[in-house]
C-alpha cells in the first residue's frame, strides 16, 4: 500500500478548530455513536494504561491509570498530559506497553492497515483489548460504484469544505490482518447503515435522522454487514 501525503493531513488537522464539524450531520452522528460505544465499555479502562491512537486530544471521559495520546497533529494533543506526535504506523513504544488501546474516528483509513494493526498489536499486552473503528467499502453509500465491496481502495470525499483522500477497506480485508496479528474479534458494531442508502434519494440531514433505525436493523444479517462504519472490540490472543 502506498502512503498518502501525511504533511497535508497533518496541516489540515492542525489548522481546523475542532475534529468533528458541528454543522456536519453525518460526522456528528459518527461522533455520537463512537462516544456512546466507549461509554458502554468504560469498565475496560479502570486502573489500566491506555494508548489513545489518533486521539485528536479527546479522552472520551475515560478514567484510567494513565493515558498516552498519539496523533500526527500536535496542535490537537499538545495540551494533553502525555502526548507524542507520531503516526500509528510506527509507534515509539516498547512491545507490550499498554493494557488497552482506543483507535477510532476512522484513523485507520489514513494508514497502511497492515502496518498500523501490526503496531497496535505489538504495543498491546497479551489479553489486552482494542476498540478499533474503520470505514468499510461494504457501506451502502458506495452501492453502484467501483469502490463497493473492494478489498482495499482509495476514495476522495469532502469534509469541512475540503477534499480528502483516504483508504477504504472491506471488513474481510481487515479481519484477515487482525487474525495475522493475533487479534480476536469479541464484538462487531456497524453504524451508518440505512443512511448510506437513503442518502442517494434524500438529503444527508434527513438520511441521518432516519438512521436511528440502525439500532434495530444492525442485528439483521442482511443489513449488519453493510455498515459504512464498523466498531470492533478486539482481544490480543496468547500465542506460545
Language-model segments: residues:
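Conserved class I S-adenosyl-L-methionine
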Residues: 1-44, 130-156
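Class I SAM-dependent methyltransferase SAM/SAH-binding core
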Residues: 49-90
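A short acidic, Gly/Pro-enriched loop at the edge of an enzyme's catalytic core
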Residues: 89-101
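A short SAM/SAH-binding and catalytic strip from SAM-dependent methyltransferases
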Residues: 100-114
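A short glycine-rich, Lys/Arg-flanked "PGG" loop and its adjoining helix->strand segment in the class I
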Residues: 114-129
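Acceptor-substrate binding/catalytic loop of class I
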Residues: 157-173
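A C-terminal cap/extension of S-adenosyl-L-methionine-dependent methyltransferases
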Residues: 187-240
